[in-house]
Amino acid sequence: LLLGLLCGLVNAALIHYTGISPLVITLGTLYLYGGGALLLSGMAGATGYEGIGGFPDSFTAFANLTFLGLPIPLVLFAVITVFFWLITHRGRFGRHLFLIGQNPRAARYAALSVNGMPYALYGLVGVASAIAALVMVSYFGSARSDLGRDLLMPALTAAVLGGANIYGGSGSVIGTALAALLVGYLQQGLQMVGIPNQ
């Protein structure tokens, strides 16, 4: 979780100090972090698609647990979705973030922390990404460097379908969550009938 937080803060720092579009920075650091994961995997002695394994049974069983009849990954997804919905759509923090995304100059004139607030948001997103990574590692039973590689386009599709503006300033957490579920179910359905999901 701390590594996810650190990666999010690095993204925020790069966006802040370079002035490059957040989408470009995020895609660039995707490959940077992927290379780091490949390096760590090689240092741990994992070869090919084997990944780092040998996790305790309690950890690998976590992704298959249920809570009130619902799978734990779905429960975590719902909890994280509600958390981000509350902070972005029901509080001052979210209103300030949307204003910073729409018009940073006006936000600066309104005495908002234009430089500090994105650090908080990217840090939170980094922690949420780390939670998702832990669930995936628990589900597959190994930490592979390429585990989330095929999720880039579905994630971007879900964000855009959910109403997010790729240039910032607008979006809906609930809409994006519903779009992510829709894209995921479409992928699974296509695989079940034998159609490639690319």
Where does each model-flagged region fall?
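Transmembrane alpha-helical segments in multi-pass inner-membrane proteins
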Residues: 8, 122, 129, 139-198
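Hydrophobic/aromatic residues within transmembrane alpha-helices
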Residues: 32, 106-107, 160, 182
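Transmembrane helix-bundle core of multi-pass membrane transporters
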Residues: 22-91, 117-119, 139-148, 195-197
